Amino acid sequence: MADTRPERRFTRIDRLPPYVFNITAELKMAARRRGEDIIDFSMGNPDGATPPHIVEKLCTVAQRPDTHGYSTSRGIPRLRRAISRWYQDRYDVEIDPESEAIVTIGSKEGLAHLMLATLDHGDTVLVPNPSYPIHIYGAVIAGAQVRSVPLVEGVDFFNELERAIRESYPKPKMMILGFPSNPTAQCVELEFFEKVVALAKRYDVLVVHDLAYADIVYDGWKAPSIMQVPGARDVAVEFFTLSKSYNMAGWRIGFMVGNKTLVSALARIKSYHDYGTFTPLQVAAIAALEGDQQCVRDIAEQYKRRRDVLVKGLHEAGWMVEMPKASMYVWAKIPEPYAAMGSLEFAKKLLNEAKVCVSPGIGFGDYGDTHVRFALIENRDRIRQAIRGIKAMFRADGLLPASSKHIHENAE
């Protein structure tokens, strides 16, 4: 007899919308099953090898029988001291390794657990739009309500941020930021964080900053840390992950520093949820942070070369995207002839007709629907192949004459 009982519903899960990236991922896999060669720019998943000295350290320490037990939720003391030295050497910022630093299982876990530890049902959280999905949905999962603050060209972000603080009820408890930005590659200077900290103190709002792309910077630019602002630790914490800087995405290790109360809150909830990450991974992370940083510069240089090929090729096709000065992404405004499609349908079109997979901007928030995101995870030959596919699509649509390399519509 068929089970006629209604399907169980789970309120926390029901608050999450369908994951838009799954749509393009499923279409990509279906195309590959049909034998189609899809150039994949969709996910920011580093394709390079982890530097050998880090792998060797992991293997060496993993041979020791005393490293296979439970670790500690805060992270081993040696790694926390290495984190403190990293901030001192890089930003001239003192971090107390005992009370102001905690190791996380990648930044995504740390962000989600921090929000679960500190947000109550009905709390208001301010998040730029567009933004990295965990910044939005970590708060939603924790039971908070998210108020979007437009982070788009032509809009004064701080005017919108202050208006959101004044007009929100209940008063916002937290704002979540990430620069250099995923997905937009937008960068800010230290003055931006000075204004954020001043605003946060004025209105008693906590600040969480995600510094995932601190090292993926180009053309001599350097990414500031919010912790460089005097008094930032009164209201702010900052996350860093080794995923991008050291090609360690699958290793799942990062850290959070800053406000002692927030560090303590994250440590408390992690003491219930986990025993920290595998000790040999933490020792390898020390080797990463304290070893020769030429490997980090080499990884950034590889992304720069890919960026240059992609942007040059898109410009040749008349798709006048902006040249990012940081991150591993190109945030591309949809060309005007396709603008009415929206980002999801345009991403489907690129997949079907150009054999190029990108992330639709709508997946990062409503204000992202005018753009698609390219992740620089394919080599330069594959990027050139993608450009040929995009040009072929433009030609088929009458936007690029067969005898010309350029289209002349306004794609800004």
UniProtKB/Swiss-Prot annotation:
GO biological process terms on file: alanine biosynthetic process; D-alanine biosynthetic process; L-alanine biosynthetic process from pyruvate
Keyword terms, alphabetized: Amino-acid biosynthesis, Aminotransferase, Cytoplasm, Pyridoxal phosphate, Transferase
Keyword Membrane tagged: no
UniProt main location, coarse: cytoplasm
A Gene Ontology cellular-component term: cytoplasm
Entry-linked NCBIfam families: PRK08175.1
Subunit composition and interactions: Homodimer.
Name of the protein in question: Glutamate-pyruvate aminotransferase AlaC
UniProt organism field: Escherichia coli (strain K12)
Chain's gene name: alaC
